[in-house]
Regions:
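Structured, basic alpha/beta domains of bacterial-type, RNA-associated proteins
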Residues: 1-19, 23-142
Length: 142
């Protein structure tokens, strides 16, 4: 029986699950929102919220815990983004840093898909994109 077993297996080996969570978390930190299957996004939510909590500590141990969970060459870059860009936004919030939005099922295999995004960051990203677009439009051509 599977009583009191935490987490989802996602039909993967332990090392593959670890790599999957690391890659999904990296993508979420860089892009601020990603679209994935519902089971993966539900599992990712706890993983990323733990990383943001580590980043809010703003100490060496928190940075090392983040780098331990984010695999690959970009772990330092992801840790810097979390600590300097994302954590200050959530300094007064105790959890609930991400939001899941259920979307339509995927067309080819009918898998349930959802969008996972940071709660207070999504409007900021849209405003920055609008400012960048207006800067490009007002630029002088050679």
């Amino acid at each position: 029986m599977r009583h009191q077993k935490k987490g989802r297996k996602l039909n993967r080996t332990a090392s593959h699950r670890k790599a999957l969570m690391s890659n999904l978390a990296s993508s979420l930190v860089i892009h601020k929102k990603i679209q994935t299957t519902e089971a993966k996004s539900k599992e990712l939510r706890g993983f990323v919220e733990r990383l943001v909590t580590y980043a809010k500590r703003d100490d060496v141990h928190g940075r090392r815990l983040i780098q331990k969970r984010i695999l690959g060459k970009r772990s330092k870059e992801i840790a810097n983004i979390l600590i300097h860009d994302i954590a200050p936004i959530y300094k007064n919030r105790n959890g609930g840093y991400t939001r899941l939005i259920k979307l339509d099922n995927r067309k080819n295999d009918n898998a349930p898909v959802s969008l996972i995004e940071f709660v207070d960051i999504a409007p900021l990203v849209i405003e920055e994109a609008a400012e960048d677009a207006s800067d490009k439009d007002s630029g002088v051509k050679d």
